[in-house]
Amino acid sequence: MSLLSEILNRDMDLFYEYLDCDVKKSDSTSDFKLVADFTEYNPLHNGHYHCMKVARSSVPDSLFVAVVPGLFERSGRGIPYILPREKRAEIAVSLGADIVVEGPPMGLMGSGQYSLCLCKMFAALNTDYIPRGYNPHEGFDEILSRINQGHHIAPKPYKIVDKTTGEVLLKDKLKEDNYVITSFSNSLSKIGFDYKDKFIFVKRIGGVSGTKIREAVTNGEFESVKDMMPDKTIEVLTNDKKSIIFSKRLDGNIIDNANNLDLNNLNLLNDKLALEIESKRPFNNLDEVLNAIPQGFSTHFKQRILSILENPIPKKDMSDFIEKYPSQIRILKYKNDDVLEVFKEKVNTENIYSVK
């Protein structure tokens, strides 16, 4: 069995373990400040490292927790991560994170679904501060200011709305990183989480190209991108190439599921989409499946559909998963036992499981 098969089979079991676990709230309290950073670390590059260092210096006596997706190893774009989350967690702790916890299965969810899950995780962690990188954009500073005033900011198609005041703050399509910030504000407001003065906004640094890093991973040559990533990331990518799962899929699973499942039952697939794909059966290879998927609103739509065909989660199960999330907190890596004890006293759940 391949590494990818082992990971995806295990993660399907873990998904249903989450689903079967009852939420248990904790009565513990702690004045210790917790900084929770959602980040994919795909892989951990200088931009991530800069954000971590700024957050740590802003709240020096704090617990830095990285929330790293997650089950099925598929990114928000629906494509396979470069490294499994355990390796990403290892790199993060070596560079300054205190604890890394498992985030939601981004690549199998719609953007609103995983944004809601992440915000529920922030609440469960009893988060005091949330660092977030952003790209400077005309008019965006006012949006950031409103968010840190605790206003309910919501992204709409080609505009950003302050739902607290009813104003349209921006008429434009946001870049992905900036969109995530407004989506967080919207989801945090929906669950009643008070985020006034809790965001630490960090201006993105230059000199990092995700495209070039992915090309280097594909080619196995990192000399051209060594200045974009910390030495630890380069070390893992160079010395542990067997762990690299980038661009790898279980093609046979995708083809078999596309041919045989009732696609309308799966998360992300509505009646129209399911019928359109099913009408082009049978499929003999991955390209035929990919070509049968119409282009959606998102540029990454096709890859997300491939991911759900690869790891078929029914709509009902995903809905129940989101409703209970996080039914347990899985720790992927932690700095030491003292940090772990502080973490357990801080968070709002008794269901804490460590893979260490």
Task: Describe the function of each predicted region.
Residues N46-Y49, E86, Y179, G207:
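Conserved structured core elements
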Residues R85-A97:
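Short, structured active-site "lid" loops
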Residues S2-F32, G78-I79, L95-K356:
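Active-site cores that bind ATP or allylic diphosphates and position pyrophosphate for catalysis
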Residues D20-P84:
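N-terminal catalytic cores of NTP/NDP-binding nucleotidyl/phosphoryl-transfer enzymes
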Residues M52-K53, A89, C119:
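Generic structural signal for well-ordered alpha-helices
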